[in-house]
C-alpha cells in the first residue's frame, strides 16, 4: 500500500495526530467544545490585533486619535476594532466556561494540563489588561494607574517596582510604549503555551463526562468532533457578531470616549466585566497588601484544586451535593462580578466581603468536606 503523506510527513503527521486521527472518547459533550473555541478566539484576536497595530500609534499625544482615525477613516476599521474589543469578551466567556467544565468534570486531575491552563489564564489576563490601556481613554489611563499601583504594596521594593513598571514617576509615554510592546508579544506567548497545554492533554487523552477510562471506546476526532466543533463555532460566532455589529459598546465604559486626563479622576474606576470578580475581592479587604494577596489568590487558588479533590469519583455527574456546591460557587462569582461594578458604599461593601469569604470557603473548605462526606455516604 502506498504511504499516506498525512501519516508520514514530519509536519503533517503532527497535525494528523492532534486533529484528524486523534482517538477521542465517544461520549464527550458540548462542554468539550470550548478548547477549540478558545483556539479560534486566539487566532481571531491575533489577526484583528495585527490589522489594528498597523494603524495604531503608541504615543500619549496620538494614541486616542489614532484609534478614532482607525474607526473613521480606515476601510472596515470600525469592524476590526469592534471585533477585537468584543472578541476579548468572548475569549473570557469561553475560558470561564472551559475552566468551569474542568472543575465540574474533574479534568484538573490531569495536573500538567491544568497547571499550563492556569498559566494561560494568567497570561490572557495580563494581555487583556495591557491591551485595555492602549486606546488611552480616561478608564484606560486610570485603570492602568490603579492596577500598576498595587505593586507598591510589595514590602520594601514596592515603590521601586512601580516606578520600574511605569518607566517614570507616573503612567506616561514610556508606560504606553511598553504596554503596546507587551500587548503585541503576549498573544504569541499564549499560542506557544497552548501548544504545551495540548501536548500534555494528548499524553493522557481527553477526560469524559463519566470520569471513567474511555480506552475501550474511542473514535477518531475527524469527522466526528471536527464537525461538532464547527457547529460550536457557528453557535459562538452568531452572538459574537450580533454584539460586535449591533451593540459594540455595550460592554465598554463610556469614560473611555474621553481622552486620558491625569488631572481628572473618573467617579468610578472599574475594569472590564471579566475582571470584576477579582476586583471585588481586591476591594473587599481594607488593607492594600491584604487586598493584593487576595486578588492573586483568587486566581492562583486554581492551582490548589487538584490537591483538594477528596472524592472517590472523578466527576460531579453522580454527586448531587458537590453539584449544589458547584452552582453555589457559580452564583457567588456572579455576585462578585456585580459587586465589582458597584460603588464602594453600604450595602455593597458587606455583600462583597461576604461573597469573597464564601468564594474561598467553598473552594478551600466545603469542596473537600463534601467530597469526603459523599465517600462516607457511598458506604451505606
Swiss-Prot record:
GO (cellular component) term, any one: respiratory chain complex III
Coarse class of the protein's main subcellular location: mitochondrion
CDD domains named in the record: cytochrome_b_C (cd00290), Cytochrome_b_N (cd00284)
Keyword list, A-Z: Electron transport, Heme, Iron, Membrane, Metal-binding, Mitochondrion, Mitochondrion inner membrane, Respiratory chain, Transmembrane, Transmembrane helix, Transport, Ubiquinone
Molecular functions (GO terms): metal ion binding; ubiquinol-cytochrome-c reductase activity
Entry's localization field: Mitochondrion inner membrane
Stored Pfam families: Cytochrom_B_C (PF00032), Cytochrome_B (PF00033)
Function: Component of the ubiquinol-cytochrome c reductase complex (complex III or cytochrome b-c1 complex) that is part of the mitochondrial respiratory chain. The b-c1 complex mediates electron transfer from ubiquinol to cytochrome c. Contributes to the generation of a proton gradient across the mitochondrial membrane that is then used for ATP synthesis.
Residues annotated to bind heme b b566: 98, 197
Binding site for heme b b562: 84, 183
Complexes and interactors: The cytochrome bc1 complex contains 11 subunits: 3 respiratory subunits (MT-CYB, CYC1 and UQCRFS1), 2 core proteins (UQCRC1 and UQCRC2) and 6 low-molecular weight proteins (UQCRH/QCR6, UQCRB/QCR7, UQCRQ/QCR8, UQCR10/QCR9, UQCR11/QCR10 and a cleavage product of UQCRFS1). This cytochrome bc1 complex then forms a dimer.
Membrane topology per record: Multi-pass membrane protein
Residue intervals passing through the bilayer: 34-54, 78-99, 114-134, 179-199, 227-247, 289-309, 321-341, 348-368
Organism: Alectoris rufa (Red-legged partridge)
Coiled-coil regions listed in the entry: none
Family: Belongs to the cytochrome b family.
Residues involved in a ubiquinone binding: 202
Gene Ontology BP term (one): mitochondrial electron transport, ubiquinol to cytochrome c
Cofactor requirement: heme b
Cofactor note: Binds 2 heme b groups non-covalently.
Domain of life according to the entry: Eukaryota
Any further remark recorded for this protein: Heme 1 (or BL or b562) is low-potential and absorbs at about 562 nm, and heme 2 (or BH or b566) is high-potential and absorbs at about 566 nm.
Lineage: Eukaryota, Metazoa, Chordata, Craniata, Vertebrata
UniProt xrefs under InterPro entries: Cyt_b/b6_C, Cyt_b/b6_C_sf, Cyt_b/b6_N, Cytb/b6-like_sf, Cytochrome_b, Cytochrome_b_C_euk/bac, Cytochrome_b_N_euk/bac, Di-haem_cyt_TM
Protein name from the UniProt record: Cytochrome b
Amino acid at each position: 500500500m502506498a504511504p499516506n503523506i498525512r501519516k508520514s510527513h514530519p509536519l503533517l503527521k503532527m497535525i494528523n495526530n492532534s486533529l484528524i486521527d486523534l482517538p477521542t472518547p465517544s461520549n464527550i459533550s458540548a462542554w468539550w467544545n470550548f478548547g477549540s473555541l478558545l483556539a479560534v478566539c486566539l487566532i481571531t484576536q491575533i489577526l484583528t490585533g495585527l490589522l489594528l497595530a498597523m494603524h495604531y500609534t503608541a504615543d500619549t499625544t496620538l494614541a486616542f486619535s489614532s484609534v478614532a482615525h482607525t474607526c473613521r477613516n480606515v476601510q472596515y476599521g470600525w469592524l476590526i476594532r469592534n471585533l477585537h474589543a468584543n472578541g476579548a469578551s468572548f475569549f473570557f466567556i469561553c475560558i470561564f466556561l472551559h475552566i468551569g467544565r474542568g472543575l465540574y468534570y474533574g479534568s484538573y486531575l490531569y495536573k500538567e494540563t491544568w497547571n499550563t491552563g492556569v498559566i494561560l489564564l494568567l497570561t490572557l489576563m495580563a494581555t487583556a489588561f495591557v491591551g485595555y490601556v492602549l486606546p488611552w481613554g480616561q478608564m484606560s489611563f486610570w485603570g492602568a494607574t490603579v492596577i500598576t499601583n498595587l505593586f507598591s504594596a510589595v514590602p520594601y521594593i514596592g515603590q521601586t517596582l512601580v516606578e520600574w513598571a511605569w518607566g517614570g514617576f507616573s503612567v506616561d509615554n514610556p508606560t504606553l510604549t511598553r504596554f503596546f510592546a507587551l500587548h503585541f508579544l503576549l498573544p504569541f506567548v499564549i499560542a506557544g503555551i497552548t501548544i504545551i497545554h495540548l501536548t500534555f492533554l494528548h499524553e493522557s487523552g481527553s477526560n469524559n463526562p463519566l470520569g471513567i477510562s474511555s480506552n475501550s471506546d474511542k473514535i477518531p476526532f475527524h469527522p466526528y468532533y471536527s464537525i461538532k466543533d464547527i457547529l460550536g463555532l457557528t453557535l459562538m460566532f452568531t452572538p459574537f457578531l450580533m454584539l460586535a455589529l449591533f451593540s459594540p459598546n455595550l460592554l465598554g465604559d463610556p469614560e473611555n470616549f474621553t481622552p486620558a486626563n491625569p488631572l481628572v479622576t473618573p467617579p468610578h474606576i472599574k475594569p472590564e466585566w471579566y475582571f470584576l470578580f477579582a476586583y471585588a475581592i481586591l476591594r473587599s479587604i481594607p488593607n492594600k497588601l491584604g487586598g493584593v494577596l487576595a486578588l492573586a489568590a483568587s486566581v492562583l487558588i486554581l492551582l490548589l484544586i487538584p490537591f483538594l479533590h477528596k472524592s472517590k469519583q472523578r466527576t460531579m455527574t453522580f454527586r448531587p451535593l458537590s453539584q449544589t456546591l458547584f452552582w453555589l460557587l457559580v452564583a457567588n462569582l456572579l455576585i462578585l462580578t456585580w459587586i465589582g461594578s458597584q460603588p464602594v458604599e453600604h450595602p455593597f461593601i458587606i455583600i462583597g466581603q461576604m461573597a469573597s469569604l464564601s468564594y474561598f470557603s467553598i473552594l478551600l473548605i466545603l469542596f473537600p468536606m463534601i467530597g469526603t462526606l459523599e465517600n462516607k455516604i457511598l458506604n451505606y
